[in-house]
């Protein structure tokens, strides 16, 4: 059985025929993505995956600029923290949290449309396993393990002809999840100001002197560009 799982995982890195979807099927996939972000019981779990991508956005941005990532914590309330040290660009590190799910989402959408949806899922498993090296709390271990199992099941147990559709739905859900998290961040700056200390926009404003609304707008702009990119990729299949 393990041998079969391994073969399925390795075969996941091969290309399949590009997706060609009727508009009705795209609508169903979009509805499924919206359900992951709007139905409370589904968001309770999918939101934690969005948080993982958020924190990995910080981590990859830091590593790309020469910082050393010292740890990632994940919490059941969908909170998280990524710490890094070094001479890297702290502003770049701090920026790429909220836009990260949307950036990964448009990547998933584009990959699925070009026949690389199952490869995106297999690559996600690899990234999640490597993330264990940086997790620094027990809750984070269980949250990450749950994500690995969930994506792993999609890789080894779902027929290859369906994996591209699931990757597309996951990509759309990540973009919608980024929008939901951004809106939640806006509420921190308007009606829940007691939580300002945990806001990436607030932290960036303190570091740079650039007002927090500018950072909120910048997050929204990147998320919007990713959504537009996903729409353009989808139009190829319509």
Predicted features by range, described:
Residues 2-30, 81-237:
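Metalloprotease/metallohydrolase-associated module, dominated by Zn2+-dependent proteases
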